[in-house]
Amino acid sequence: MAKIKKIFTNFLRLLALAATVVAIVFMVTSHDSAQVLNLTFTVKYSNTPVFKYFVIAEAIAGGYIVISILLSFKSLFWRLLVILDMVTAVLLTSSISAALAIAQVGKKGNTHAGWLPVCEQVPDFCDQVTIALIAGFAAAIIYFVLLLCSLYVVLSPIFVVTP
């Protein structure tokens, strides 16, 4: 049974790794140009600090996933995984939340602040950012499930009732 749990959690880690890689690739390659009143402006992820944070957080999570898969076969490392899985889940959640807030402003604008929506002028950029955010959201959900699995592995011996 323990072997099945490890296989399942490593499968989830590989899914999370795939989601983080997709999120990073789509965010880093997102760029577009638009011409407004004979002025050309270019948008790319690196123009926005929140999108940089998103990429860095996804990269940290992806690196941790690789390390955790390599070290998951050592029994002493499993207790530490709970804490690191929690940190990674929180990191992914904070980065996706911040990036979603900025993406919403880019898509809808903010009439109270006088910010106009930009996605009508740069649709390719917004489409790529949307795909990156969906992949990042998937990674965060997978990591939440991983956190629950890690908690179960660590806490299940505590709640075992012996007759």
From Swiss-Prot:
Residues 28-52, 101-128 are extracellular. It holds the Pfam family CASP_dom. It comes from the Eukaryota. Glycans are attached at N38. Keywords: Cell membrane, Glycoprotein, Membrane, Transmembrane, Transmembrane helix. It is found in: Cell membrane. The chain crosses the membrane at residues 7-27, 53-73, 80-100, 129-149. Residues 1-6, 74-79, 150-163 are cytoplasmic. One of its GO terms (cellular component) is plasma membrane. Its main location: membrane. It is a multi-pass membrane protein. The keyword Cell membrane applies. Belongs to the Casparian strip membrane proteins (CASP) family. Homodimer and heterodimers. This is CASP-like protein 1C3.
